[in-house]
Amino acid sequence: MPLPLTSLAADGPRLSPIVAGAWRMADWGWNAQQRLRWIEQCAELGVTSFDHADIYGGYSVEALFGEALALAPSSLRERLQIVSKCGIKLVATARPQHRIKHYDSSAAHIVASAEASLRALRVERLELLLIHRPDALMDADEVALAFEALRAAGKVAHFGVSNFTPAQFELLASRTPLVTNQIELHPLQRAPLADGTLDQLQRLRIRPMIWSPLAGGALLTGQGEAERRVQAALARIAQRHGCASATIAFAWLLRLPSRPVPVSGSRRIEALREALDALRITLDAQDWTEVWQ
């Protein structure tokens, strides 16, 4: 079912309104054909954008995805938009030279990471590359040079950041065009609603991407007092709208005037359908606030 692609910014990439996240793919225990079938099912629903990072699965997920994608016909591969991230260096078997987890936003690392992602994913271009986390040692001019080199080489079309504060975003945006800030946001993590993150993006007409829209599942199954309060509100509103509680959680995000683009992290196609159902629901202010309170 084709879904209209949506722009993250005036000159930004066009992504599906819900993005499929591959973060946990290494834990799914699937062979390449099963991974390909998941990609196909996502695309059949109109979800053609996939969110990655070099570090996912201990530096293994991009290669798992690429192995599956290599089995796909070109007609499918050409429909997909691939997002990846770089800038975190984990202690991992695949990176024995890393003594501690740290950040690296040097031009050399950004370029090398993007090129490694392209090889692992078996694609020629990333639609969007994000700096994964703020780096206290980030030289904004150096990052801008790396972005321009990757853009000029045709290896990355657009650039953004993830988990940046408004001041950090403003600094890097003063040197190079940014098209999104991918942040954590849900009814249990509401800081971006008050710390200026969403206000800044709305002012710039740049849409945020949202990771962990269901709080890692806590919005549906968490046992804490706050989790249960939100679950009860979601259930009441879902009953009124005749949909799943997860659908209301996504609709709560989509109601925001900054027009977020959520990343669904589930391997379950039914969970993706529930996220997509939110595109047909507009919560009124009372419903939205009922989840907030």
Which sequence ranges carry the predicted segments?
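N-terminal binding-site loop/beta-alpha segment at the start of enzyme catalytic domains
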Residues: M1-Q81
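Short, acidic/polar
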Residues: G29-C42, S105-L121, T165-F169
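Alpha-helix N-cap and loop-to-helix initiation/capping positions
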Residues: W30-R37, S60, L64, H98-H109, ...
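A structural motif
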Residues: V47, V123-L126, V156, L178
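Active-site groove signature of glycoside hydrolases
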Residues: L118-L137
